[in-house]
Curated annotation (Swiss-Prot):
This is Uncharacterized MFS-type transporter YcaD. CDD domains: MFS_YcaD_like. The gene is ycaD. Belongs to the major facilitator superfamily. YcaD (TC 2.A.1.26) family. GO terms for molecular function: transmembrane transporter activity. The keyword Membrane applies. Pfam families: MFS_1. PROSITE patterns: MFS. SUPFAM superfamilies: MFS general substrate transporter. It is a multi-pass membrane protein. GO terms for cellular component: plasma membrane. Keywords: Cell inner membrane, Cell membrane, Membrane, Transmembrane, Transmembrane helix, Transport. The keyword Acyltransferase does not apply.
Amino acid sequence: MSTYTRPVMLLLCGLLLLTLAIAVLNTLVPLWLAQANLPTWQVGMVSSSYFTGNLVGTLFTGYLIKRIGFNRSYYLASLIFAAGCVGLGGMVGFWSWMSWRFIAGIGCAMIWVVVESALMCSGTSHNRGRLLAAYMMAYYMGTFLGQLLVSKVSGELLHVLPWVTGMILAGILPLLFTRIVNQQTQARHSSSISAMLKLRQARLGVNGCIISGIVLGSLYGLMPLYLKHQGMANASIGFWMAVLVSAGILGQWPMGRLADKFGRLLVLRVQVFVVILGSIAMLTQAAMAPALFILGAAGFKLYPVAMAWACEKVEHHQLVAMNQALLLSYTVGSLLGPSFAAMLMQNYSDNLLFIMIASVSFIYLLMLLRNAGQTPNPVAHI
């Protein structure tokens, strides 16, 4: 059976359109709030409400998938996200936008859980690495193209909202032409997120998602600030961020194939070691281009490989709950990482950004080295 089936390809096409919309809004919302003369702390609170929505959406989407299936859950998630987008046009204000971004955050998290769970349930232990690589390539490509759109079109609120909303609704269309079967509905026993988080054999995967959240959240959120403090102009900052994201895109497919062929544990060990090397190289500031490239190529692939590791340790009917637990772990890491790194940078030195990334990666590497090997016959093999 082909890895990239028709439902998988249509699902990824829809994700690409939705990710474009997410990238555009995540970039422009803080700018719109600043133009409305809201204080910085309120802009930060609006951003936090979006991530809080992510947490909430992650928690209940598994139940929703079990009740109404993948397709309808995807439609509902997209409509919630579209509502959060349309609502921004009503009134620019702190409480109003905090509410609408919370709603948008719920919708976005639901989309991620549905897409990731559908891919996990569509694949086997032999091809999940490639499926998740394709997922991350679509996600990062959408993010990259979204940034290009922001630089090419009008940034006025009432000019942007109509076509972004249209793009969200267009993201629903591909799934109208296929049906993704939810094999969980036949399972007698449902699994909870807390049970998945406590599962001993999947702990390396859960920890990997937390570490991935810390690393990527810190790079996304604080790398521009680090480069700004190095005296770079906005154009240069954009170039180096493009190098970072492009490396993440290019590293997805080969890493996914290697993980399927040689095992996730070995690939995770190599990836984490490369992240440490890239972080140390950034401290020297001698060769920023190769340092950023290897940091992006290895760091951006941690999440899908760790996810594939955890998902092969559970029964097939537990995959949705496990995916919720992993996305929740990643979200927690992406909230904690930038906050802690920003505090270190403000009080001590900007270089502590990379020291922190190297330190948490080293801790995870020790966890990986303690594991003697992989399960020879993964549980979720069908």
